[in-house]
Amino acid sequence: MSANWFKNFAGFRPSEFEMLQVPNPKLEFGIHVTIRSMQTGALIGSILGPISLLVSQKANNKQNYIDSFVSGGQNGAVIGAIMGPVLTYLSVREMNTISLYDKCYRLRFNQDALRQDRTAVFSAAVGLLSSGSTGLVVGLDLSLLISKLMSGCRW
């Protein structure tokens, strides 16, 4: 990761020369994949948590559903954080240096991907700081749904 990558990620447009410099393409690609896998894991966990409570026939009250939503989302986000580097490794080992550089270079200019990654980091941070783990899960879930809607519902 470099200062140029962070500047682009934060929304400050670097020069063309700075955009050409990709000193750590594996790390840049890994961050992108890990953010996406955490978002996906949190959303799937948030859906499966209440469903598992419903299937288990335990005492079904509102607080139990909220707790299962949060714990499912947290577990999904943790699994996504673990799977992100694994998925990155599996993808990168099949790429040569030029194709990896090309992928990172394209990600730097892909406004939809940048918007989705920025939204995930920002909403997860705001959610965590405002409401703890519940806010983190809701932030990750909403960031995925909103960014998909903003990019034209291309699932």
Regions found by a protein language model. Give the residues of each.
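Intrinsically disordered, low-complexity N-proximal targeting/linker segments that flank membranes
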Residues: 1-47, 61-64, 150-155
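Juxtamembrane "helix exit" motif at the C-terminal ends of alpha-helical transmembrane segments
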Residues: 44-61, 129-130, 145
